Amino acid sequence: MFFLLCVTCCRSTETPVSAPDESVEAVPTQKLDRFSTQHTEAGVLKWTLVGDTSTFHGSYIDVENPTVQIFEDGVVSMTLNSQKGKQFLNGTKKDSLHLTGNVVGVSKDGKLFTETLHWQNLAGRLYAPDEATVVRGDSTWIGTEMLANPTLETVKMKNNRFNLYPKDEKAHEHHKTPIEPE
């Protein structure tokens, strides 16, 4: 009788660190202030990511106030800023980035404004699923489901609304990276 009572009374009443329905991925394993990383392919710099803080979750890293620089041929082709960012570390999205909250991109050929933006590293293109605005000089182009190369030389969108001025647009622009879906 005493043994049964001891087993019953000695049960732990501590709450586990993560709730049973919470995935292991959601529980951060490391948090850093002033985070910085870069991605290279065959020794060639492709992008850099700098943020105020980062939280490592196993297959991805959350970043607060990220700044991303995307490089082509060793030169910055676009600089992106947002409120939140995510770097994917494995799987089909490996080395890709997801930015949310007041995303602003600046390239030599214009500016980009949206709420959600994906840098699809393998394809070498930007994708904004929701409304995006591209500004070149006085020209403004608004649409959804934007696909673009990082210099904004080539942009494709649906549900277009625009005010375009010839002085801001170059005829027959073509970029070496296709923007069509894979």
Language model regions located:
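Mature-chain termini and adjacent capping regions
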Residues: 1-182
